[in-house]
């Protein structure tokens, strides 16, 4: 057996759903949930973390289909951190990973994140000022 030290590449974390014509029930993973595909079908949800550039799976959690994505990030991040035992990793995710609690969890564990902010609430109103404040002064063209 050989063991290789993988370089610290970005860790991608995202959820997806699988829907189908399945019987559900209280104890079933197959539940109705928010669906981009067909809300009349039951679904299961899978949260996965992979290591770039290989797409190497680091963790997979399958849950019932009615669960929200944002509550699945921290447990998956913790699973990855237990596996890699490193600080300074870059976690990449969608806007659901931008929840303040998830970002705070990453910072508390000395990790980095790259995720778009969800344009809801005060974020949508304040973002133009943040961008303006971050841009260098550019003299007008003559």
Regions found by a protein language model. Name each.
Residues 1-142:
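Anion-binding and metal-coordination hotspots
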